[in-house]
């Protein structure tokens, strides 16, 4: 049975992520009756949304309905390419980010994170847990001090229910639920303001799903993180 929850956000608080009149179309070349034609697939049709600090938006729909495309577009993981048409506007806080180049967008990347569906495929098997989390701290936050990085990793591992003493181990040494905790920790070690949760429990057993959902709720409460939850 669904449980009633207290709201963690202020309805009159600051806007974190805003999308206005978003349209996303993928153009694919197909061959019909010996001729090349362009097939246009409208994945997202005129969507607008506005999320406050600490708010959660759930997006539910069948496979192929554009849920992930919408979420990844807000994170600038789907960009305008030769076969992709994107229109509309995206704001992060008061900054208009939809027209930024990759280089201009880089300062925003650590504040906007994603937790993927499959904890087995989303982690690099060649990196230890420490290296997986350290990567973002070095690349996104440019933290050069090793002790500072280690302190952040130990803190977030404790927060997600992982033993810091296991940080030298590799993903294959953990269960599915533990791997998803690692993936969540990888995002939250950067202290993001907005996280896209792309079916984060669908690959897990039912008993583990509840534990992960409880963890995500607690992290949201602690950090006032804004979520889009795709299911």
Predicted regions and their residues:
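Conserved ABC ATPase signature
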Residues: 170-174, 178
